Amino acid sequence: MGRGKIEIKRIENTTNRQVTFSKRRGGLLKKAHELSVLCDAELGLIIFSSSGKLFEYSSASSSMKKIIERYQKVSGARITEYDNQHLYCEMTRMKNENEKLQTNIRRMMGEDLTSLTMTELHHLGQQLESASSRVRSRKNQLMLQQLENLRRKERILEDQNSHLCRLLAEQQAAVEGVQEPLLEFGVFCPPPDNKTAAAANAGPLHLGHHLPAFRLQPTQPNLQESSIVPNRPVLQL
């Protein structure tokens, strides 16, 4: 009878898993050696066990380092060591650039000028003049913007003032329109002010002269009052 197929899945038993790993690792290394010798192949094999132990194999005509370097050239991949070296070079470049910028700032502030040559001083002067010109240009631009804002506010205030003047003229015309009919009856109404407004609120408006009071008397003698105030006219019905 033939052997049954083994299901490919993780072996849960630790002892059985270690025994199987040892057997299959040996078979894999044997196959790698045979492939390298029979086919003249440059071969590298790296194995890590579940416990982290390293096992490796490389062709007799080469080494693991040479195989990895060749792999990097062909695939373009990088190992951490090379990445760290590239990062160190980049940090060094940025540090030098930062120091150069700090030196330029100090020189623009008028410091550390003793080591500069005449050509370098002339170039520094041109840089300062260019920077000063840009500062003046920006300053003038801001001043023009502020002036335009003030002019805009002035126009707004003028429009508001014109609107208020129109409202005042309309109110004045309305008051004069009310006074004209009253003048026909001999009534004069001065323009309203604080005093006249207070007087208007204090009591009713009295028109012309006071008229004498009249009393109504019935025509029947028996309904007339017994006493009539003398010198007062009596209106007969």
From Swiss-Prot:
Residues 84-174 form the K-box domain. The keyword Transcription applies. It is found in: Nucleus. GO terms for biological process: positive regulation of transcription by RNA polymerase II. Keywords: DNA-binding, Nucleus, Transcription, Transcription regulation. It comes from the Eukaryota. Expression specific for female reproductive structures: strong at the adaxial base of the cupules, where ovules will later develop, then in the outermost cell layer of the nucellus, in the inner envelope, and in the inner half of the middle envelope at late stage of ovule development. One of its GO terms (cellular component) is nucleus. InterPro entries: MADS-box/MEF2_TF, MEF2-like_N, TF_Kbox, TF_MADSbox, TF_MADSbox_sf. One of its GO terms (molecular function) is DNA-binding transcription factor activity. Its main location: nucleus. Residues 1-61 form the MADS-box domain. Signal peptide: none annotated. Probable transcription factor. This is MADS-box protein GGM13. The lineage of its organism: Eukaryota, Viridiplantae, Streptophyta, Embryophyta, Tracheophyta. The gene is GGM13.
